[in-house]
Curated annotation (Swiss-Prot):
Taxonomy of the source species: Bacteria, Pseudomonadati, Pseudomonadota, Betaproteobacteria, Burkholderiales
Alphabetical GO biological process terms: glucose metabolic process; glyoxylate cycle; tricarboxylic acid cycle
UniProt entry keywords in alphabetical sequence: ATP-binding, Cytoplasm, Glyoxylate bypass, Hydrolase, Kinase, Nucleotide-binding, Protein phosphatase, Serine/threonine-protein kinase, Transferase, Tricarboxylic acid cycle
Organism expressing this protein natively: Polaromonas naphthalenivorans (strain CJ2)
Name of the featured protein: Isocitrate dehydrogenase kinase/phosphatase
NCBIfam families from the UniProt entry: PRK02946.1 (NF002804)
């Protein structure tokens, strides 16, 4: 029950200290995000990667700071519960005119649950649902930018409007030929619109912040005409060197203004599917300067209605808010469904126990207590690998995960087979009890990773085999899968990631047909591996031996040995050798390793090469 009077002398001080802690967090988060513009302008790619990694750690650091302050100044953990009731009410009052209330509520939950005992994690003490609306939040300060800008082109001035639209972002680096690129965009927009009549409300709306990731900046907006809306994005890149030209860089890998090239609009992406791939859960988080993040999320959701708000917050780098919203969505789904959790279909992993709820598009992964001898690893090492992926550029090829502790599920929703599986392989991670004292038995998982469910690649291929490889549809499916598999590995190589275990079962197919890796317990940095050719046998005995007769170090990798594990099917082998035979050659890996060690940052495009203007409009510019 909430108190009728706010009579505690310390409750307001605790609430104020907590909101001060959040404001400090978001100020630092926003400052780091805004600096991405300068790093893009100066081609500081290594700085951009470093900032993306470090920003992920900001939230936990600020939560820890706030918790320490509350304990030191107010002995917060010793305060009675009626004081904590009042703290929450004061905190709600402080959020009335706040520009990030939903993030501040989540921050309150994080700090409170760090201080209070779990038995107090009830609706009265934390924000189970939002208390403050995020609708129509606006910054009324005269110097504040609106969330988005609107432009009203006509048939006659579309080209000039697009030039102004890009110039309004104020990039401090010259374009190679902005008028030419704006012409390409205008042509692409005209083709997309077709012969429709331009209505009275015809306009282009663009979010006022550029979206920065890796070596690109993205204009994100939508075209509105009558009752129709078309989402779009314009990738802006530094001009690439001509084939064979290598741009010199200093010791930090930063190219000079003249060397790195001028800016170009590289493509025009249209429609929800293109945007969903751009904002995919398998890519690194964007850096974008947002005063009112909920307004950005609302705008993006209007463009991608199939994308959960939780994943949009994740894509914007606000992973803790994404985690909060995901859990709320999960509880809502549980309340409105009746199916049971089960052991996930597919080949069981040696390190992870995986289960799912058929009606829910995610899987739950628990680290096992015991591993077979060939898996020389520990729980902490596995958690370290998942953290590495979280902080790394996932280049659209590694699934993002959400990490949770002490997650409670209704016992009646778990199949007995699943309970037996957890008791056998991960007993330390399982508790079955009435923890809340409400008479309902719960399954409590101590530590779990949650990620998007995909079709395992081995199952996808088996479906084609079962259909019959002589059938054109089956052969097309095999070709798409194998080509995408090789592309996925090469994209990961470009990001300095060696997957370790390259078996088909460790990759999945997304709804857009992309192949994504999701088994991280053996990943390594490419630069930490030693890629070798298998030595020439010394004699006939070596050649005929079924055992490895040569020395193998802990980080040694022999690419030519991948074939027997991957290419047992003739149809698969034919496609693989046609498109990706280089993956079986140690020289391929050594070459990429050397370039990464030399400071080169590869380009990985979140769209098809055929959509690039340099491809569509010929060799007029290097691209």
């Amino acid at each position: 029950m909430f108190p009728q009077r706010l009579d505690s002398t310390v409750a307001y001080a605790i609430a104020k200290a907590m909101i001060d802690g959040f404001n400090r967090h978001y100020r630092l988060f926003r400052t780091e995000s805004a600096r991405a513009k300068h790093r893009f302008e100066t081609a500081d790619w290594h700085g951009q990667q470093r900032a993306q990694r470090e920003r992920i750690e900001f939230y936990d650091l600020r939560v820890r700071e706030a918790s320490i302050r509350l304990e030191r100044e107010f002995k917060a953990g010793e305060q009675p519960m009626d004081v904590w009731h009042q703290v929450k009410l004061h905190y709600i009052g402080l959020l009335v005119n706040h520009h990030q209330p939903e993030l501040a509520e989540t921050f309150f939950n994080s700090v409170t649950t760090k201080i209070l005992h779990r038995s107090y994690f009830q609706n009265d003490f934390i924000f189970v649902r939002p208390a403050v609306s995020t609708e129509y939040i606006e910054n009324q300060e005269p110097t504040a930018q609106p969330t988005y800008r609107a432009y009203y082109p006509t048939q006659g001035n579309m080209h000039e409007t697009l030039v102004k639209l890009v110039e309004d972002f104020g990039l401090c680096r010259e374009f190679e030929d902005l008028r030419r690129d704006a012409g390409y965009v205008a042509e692409a927009m005209a083709a997309r619109l077709g012969d429709v009549k331009l209505r009275a409300n015809f306009q282009i709306q663009v979010l006022s912040g550029l979206f920065f990731r890796n070596k690109g900046a993205y204009v994100v907006g939508k075209i509105i005409n009558g009752f129709g809306e078309i989402p779009f994005a314009l990738p802006i890149l530094h001009r690439q060197p001509a084939p064979g030209q290598v741009l010199p860089a200093d010791g930090k890998g930063i190219s000079s203004q003249s060397d790195a090239g001028k800016l170009v609009i590289d493509a025009a992406l249209f429609g929800e599917d293109d945007l969903l791939i751009l904002f995919s859960f398998a890519r690194a988080y964007f850096m974008v300067d947002m005063g009112i993040p909920s307004a950005f999320v609302q705008f993006l959701r209007s463009m991608m209605p199939r994308m959960p708000r939780a994943e949009i917050y994740n894509a914007l780098g606000l992973a803790k808010q994404g985690k909060t919203l995901f859990y709320r969505d999960f509880l809502h789904h549980l309340r409105h469904s009746t199916d049971k959790f089960r052991i996930a279909p597919g080949i069981k992993g040696m390190v992870m126990l995986v289960f799912d709820l058929p009606s829910f598009p995610y899987v739950f992964k628990v680290i096992k207590d015991y591993y077979p001898p060939q898996k020389d690893t520990t729980r902490e090492q596995i958690k370290g690998k998942y953290l590495l992926v979280k902080q790394h550029d996932r280049v659209g090829r590694m699934a993002d995960t959400q990490e949770y502790s002490e997650v409670a599920f209704p016992r009646e929703r778990f199949s007995d087979e699943l309970i037996a599986e957890i008791e056998k392989f991960a007993p330390s991670q399982l508790e079955i009890s009435d923890r809340d004292g409400d008479g309902q038995m719960e399954v409590i998982i101590k530590h779990v990773y949650i990620e998007r469910r995909m079709i395992p690649l081995n199952i996808y291929l088996q479906e084609a085999f079962d259909f019959g490889v002589a059938e054109p549809a089956a052969r097309d499916q095999i070709e798409r899968a194998v080509v995408e598999y090789g592309n996925a590995i090469k994209d990961m190589v470009a990001a300095n990631i060696f997957p370790g275990d390259m078996l088909w079962k460790n990759f999945g197919i997304t709804r857009h047909g992309k192949v994504v890796f999701y088994d991280y317990d053996e990943i390594e940095y490419i630069t930490d591996c030693k890629f070798r050719k298998v030595p020439t046998p010394r004699n006939e005995e070596d050649e005929m031996s079924g055992e490895v007769w040569y020395s193998v170090g802990p980080k040694d990798v022999f690419p030519e040995t991948f074939g027997p594990f991957l290419l047992g099917n003739d149809a698969v082998r034919e496609v693989f050798m046609k498109h990706h035979a280089d993956l079986l050659d140690a020289a391929f890996w050594q070459r990429h390793q050397a370039r990464i060690q030399a400071g080169h940052v590869y380009d990985v495009f979140p769209y098809d090469q055929q959509k690039r203007f340099a491809v569509m409009h010929g060799p007029a510019r290097a691209g």
